[in-house]
From Swiss-Prot:
Specifically methylates guanosine-37 in various tRNAs. InterPro entries: Alpha/beta_knot_MTases, tRNA_m1G_MeTrfase_C_sf, tRNA_m1G_MeTrfase_TrmD, tRNA_m1G_MTases_N, tRNA_MeTrfase_TRMD/TRM10. Keywords: Cytoplasm, Methyltransferase, S-adenosyl-L-methionine, Transferase, tRNA processing. Pfam families: tRNA_m1G_MT. It catalyses: guanosine(37) in tRNA + S-adenosyl-L-methionine = N(1)-methylguanosine(37) in tRNA + S-adenosyl-L-homocysteine + H(+). GO terms for cellular component: cytosol. Its EC number is 2.1.1.228. This is tRNA (guanine-N(1)-)-methyltransferase. It is found in: Cytoplasm. GO terms for molecular function: tRNA (guanine(37)-N1)-methyltransferase activity. The keyword Heme does not apply. The keyword tRNA processing applies.
Length: 239
């Protein structure tokens, strides 16, 4: 998969591709990337890429011309273009799985008040919001999307990890609690079931704790889970 990021500040993005698991994925040939600086496509002598908003209002808007030139520069026939914006559709793990099947993802990083709507109308396949909050940097949102997608690609991480983690393909629940050494930390001991060696009991404990956490922290996901399994198996009676 190739990630192409169009940004006013590509230097924010670059280090992510040079470290940790992403670096290994690139070395394996699983991932490639291109960073495009919108300023390189500005015809303004000062390389400005923003202007005042028609109709008035606070803040500046990214201009259509340099953004259009930057997008036309991308040489890909099977690209999916995404603009990250608080006004977009809600980003979910399900959408991350869908995007992980694409060949190339082009990400437009917003700044200021956003970009000229005509760029969205002409070029964007998905306008996506990573949450109900506002960032000053579209680059941060881009990194969230990139990280959530590339880790789903074959050969990046252990596929079993994807089944057990929060929002995983297995059941959609939040992940169960984890413990490691030491056994006793500040008077709190690891639950006995986890050191019992009884794999079936451990499996049942983890499912119970995952359901418990999901019900407490994300009741909306808990209700979806109940719809999937068709019943609550008496879980509510235990709490």
């Amino acid at each position: 998969m190739k990630f192409t990021v169009i940004s006013l500040f590509p230097a924010i993005i670059k280090p992510f591709f040079e470290n940790s698991i992403m670096k290994k994925a690139i070395n394996k040939g699983i991932v490639s990337f291109e960073l495009i600086d919108v300023r390189d496509f500005s015809k303004d002598k000062h390389k400005r890429c923003d202007d005042l908003s028609y109709g008035g209002g606070a803040g500046m808007v990214l201009k259509a011309e340099p953004m259009s030139f930057a997008l036309e520069h991308v040489e890909a026939t099977k690209k999916t273009t995404i603009f990250l914006s608080p006004s977009g559709i809600k980003y979910t793990q399900e959408l991350a799985y869908s995007l992980s099947k694409k060949e190339e993802i082009v990400i437009i990083c917003g700044r200021y008040e956003g970009i000229d709507q005509r760029i969205i109308d002409l070029y964007v396949d998905f306008e996506i919001s990573i949450g109900d909050y506002v960032l000053s940097s579209g680059e941060i949102a881009a990194l969230v999307l990139i990280d959530s997608v590339y880790r789903l690609l074959d050969g990046v991480i252990n596929p079993n990890s994807l089944l057990e983690e929060s929002f995983g393909m297995k059941n959609g629940l939040l992940e169960y609690p984890h413990y490691t050494r030491p056994y006793n930390f500040m008077g709190i001991k690891v639950p006995e079931v986890l050191v019992s060696g009884h794999h079936e009991n451990i499996k049942n404990w983890r499912l119970f704790k995952a359901r418990e956490k999901t019900k407490k922290n994300r009741y909306d996901l808990y209700l979806k889970y109940l719809e999937i399994i068709g019943e609550d198996n008496g879980f509510d009676k235990k709490n």
